[in-house]
């Protein structure tokens, strides 16, 4: 892949979306993970200014992620704001009858979405997405949470390709070396949740996408079963609500 051309195409896409919407710029959630770090870097290259980052940790968020996010803001000279969302989450815990880790993780993602759109309106800017193709195909995200955005420049790149582009753009090694995590609860790991590494997941997704039967026969049947199950079960997350036509 020609990463220079891909970078230029992504930057053009960001510029076009902001211009066509008559917005001032973009707002993004900066978690300290590689996906949002890459999007922030692309936004800075594309827009130079009017890139606003929200850092929204909870009490159990990995402190190293916040430090990495702050370092990136300094390196890119980004305007940012830290909003601790634990008090909002605590209010939910007091009222809700469903306080499983998954439920709390989903609610935290929706708190962040609400804040992003609030600042989007305040700054006349677009919320830019940070989900990669692997996550989108699997529905590995919170509907109306981290999946919510006005547009997404990296949604056509598999997670393994995100790492390649991040290296090409010289992102700090901390982003590249850390284990993938949505940081929804303490010690949460994407690959542990999914049961396979992203390298294997992407290999399976590509084989399914191209219907490469020869490759599919060589892959772990449990991997393919997991991928098909998640893709089928979570298809609704990538669609607008269906409206009955009268």
UniProtKB/Swiss-Prot annotation:
Deamido-NAD(+) binds at residue 110. Mg(2+) binds at residues 35, 135. CDD domains: NAD_synthase (cd00553). It is an enzyme of class 6 (ligase). It catalyses: deamido-NAD(+) + NH4(+) + ATP = AMP + diphosphate + NAD(+) + H(+). GO terms for cellular component: cytoplasm. InterPro entries: NAD/GMP_synthase (IPR022310), NAD_synthase (IPR003694), NH(3)-dep_NAD(+)_synth (IPR022926), Rossmann-like_a/b/a_fold (IPR014729). Keywords: ATP-binding, Ligase, Magnesium, Metal-binding, NAD, Nucleotide-binding. Pathway: Cofactor biosynthesis; NAD(+) biosynthesis; NAD(+) from deamido-NAD(+) (ammonia route): step 1/1. The keyword NAD applies. Gene3D superfamilies: HUPs. GO terms for molecular function: ATP binding; glutaminase activity; metal ion binding; NAD+ synthase (glutamine-hydrolyzing) activity; NAD+ synthase activity. The keyword Nucleotide-binding applies. It comes from the Bacteria. One of its GO terms (biological process) is NAD biosynthetic process. ATP binds at residues 29-36, 130, 159, 181. Its EC number is 6.3.1.5. Pfam families: NAD_synthase. Homodimer. NCBIfam families: nadE (TIGR00552), PRK13980.1 (NF010587). Belongs to the NAD synthetase family. Catalyzes the ATP-dependent amidation of deamido-NAD to form NAD. Uses ammonia as a nitrogen source. This is NH(3)-dependent NAD(+) synthetase. It comes from Campylobacter jejuni subsp. jejuni serotype O:6 (strain 81116 / NCTC 11828).
């Amino acid at each position: 892949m020609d990463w220079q051309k891909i970078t230029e195409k992504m930057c053009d896409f960001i510029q076009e979306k902001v211009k066509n919407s008559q917005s001032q710029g973009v707002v993004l959630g900066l978690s300290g993970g590689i996906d949002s770090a890459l999007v922030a870097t692309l936004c800075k290259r594309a827009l130079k200014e009017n890139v606003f980052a929200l850092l929204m940790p909870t009490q159990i968020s990995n402190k190293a992620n916040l430090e990495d996010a702050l370092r990136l803001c300094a390196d890119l000279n980004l305007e940012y704001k830290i909003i601790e969302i634990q008090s909002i989450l605590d209010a939910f815990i007091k009222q809700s009858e469903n306080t499983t880790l998954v439920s709390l993780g989903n609610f935290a993602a929706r708190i962040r979405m609400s804040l992003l759109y609030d600042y989007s309106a305040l700054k006349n800017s677009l919320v830019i997405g940070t989900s990669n193709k692997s996550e989108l195909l699997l529905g590995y995200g919170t509907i109306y949470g981290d999946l919510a955005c006005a547009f997404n420049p990296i949604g056509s790149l598999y997670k393994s390709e995100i790492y390649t582009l991040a290296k090409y753009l010289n992102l700090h090694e901390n982003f590249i070396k850390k284990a993938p995590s949505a940081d929804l609860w303490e010690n949460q790991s994407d690959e542990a949740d999914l049961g396979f590494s992203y390298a294997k997941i992407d290999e399976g997704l590509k084989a399914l996408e191209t219907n490469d039967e020869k490759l599919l026969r060589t892959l772990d049947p449990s991997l393919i079963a997991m991928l098909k199950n998640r893709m089928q079960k979570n298809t609704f997350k990538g669609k607008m609500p269906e409206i009955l036509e009268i």
